Amino acid sequence: MSWIERIKSNITPTRKASIPEGVWTKCDSCGQVLYRAELERNLEVCPKCDHHMRMSARNRLHSLLDEGSLVELGSELEPKDVLKFRDSKKYKDRLASAQKETGEKDALVVMKGTLHGMPVVAAAFEFAFMGGSMGSVVGARFVRAVEQALEDNCPLICFSASGGARMQEALMSLMQMAKTSAALAKMQERGLPYISVLTDPTMGGVSASFAMLGDLNIAEPKALIGFAGPRVIEQTVREKLPPGFQRSEFLIEKGAIDMIVRRPEMRLKLASILAKLMNLPAPNPDAPREGVVVPPAPGQESEA
């Protein structure tokens, strides 16, 4: 028996450990392998490169509003395939698939609650539901959010993440642009704040309507914001676009948005802004939401 065979005979193979699916994930930006539970505590922000990953509508609203204060609005509204639309797949089949995948009936979730004790109405897009596209139910739920804010005499916050109008609903989808914008005019008449938070991506008919009509338009870092996408624009104008075109950092340089706020700092920032606008006491910055870790941006860690 050769020396290699003698060594091999003394080696006992170890049993391969089985790791449950979904425990680990990878950052789309830097490629870092991340522990899923830690990433959720960091509000889907990569602790290595500060990349803001896409966040579900419900997780976003639950991380924003005070625990125990959330009441969902418009959950009874469901999309209908009135046009019997079909492209490569029937619209009703696309809806059923999206509903099964996300657990949502449509792409916008609306809740009322409190933010640091202040009554607010908040809406958030579920991008995983047909790209967060805006159809008649999205428009109806947004109007319901406006009506609730008017009834409660409180601010409205909307987190947009959408590819634009839903082509399967044709004109009924495009009509939501005017419908939602008209509803916001009532907020302005009443003097109630409407804050629009633009997340990645905010495009098409959503960016061309209520997403850019906030009293303050706030964006998350490196969010893609615009009407047509960069590739479509380059093909149309036949020119190379400047670096960072349509990203939030590019837009704030051009004065198209008001500020960029990191997601872990968003809750306190929104509460502070709304407290000033509503003439209410400033929120306590030393009272972080239970269970939520506020990681510093890379390069800004404390020296402790």
Swiss-Prot record:
Gene3D superfamilies, per the entry: 2-enoyl-CoA Hydratase, Chain A, domain 1
Keyword Nucleotide-binding: yes
Signal peptide: none
Keyword Nucleotide-binding attached: yes
Residue numbers spanned by region Disordered: 284-304
Highest taxon listed in the record's lineage: Bacteria
Places the protein is found: Cytoplasm
Chief place where the protein resides: cytoplasm
Membership in a protein family: Belongs to the AccD/PCCB family.
Protein name: Acetyl-coenzyme A carboxylase carboxyl transferase subunit beta
Gene: accD
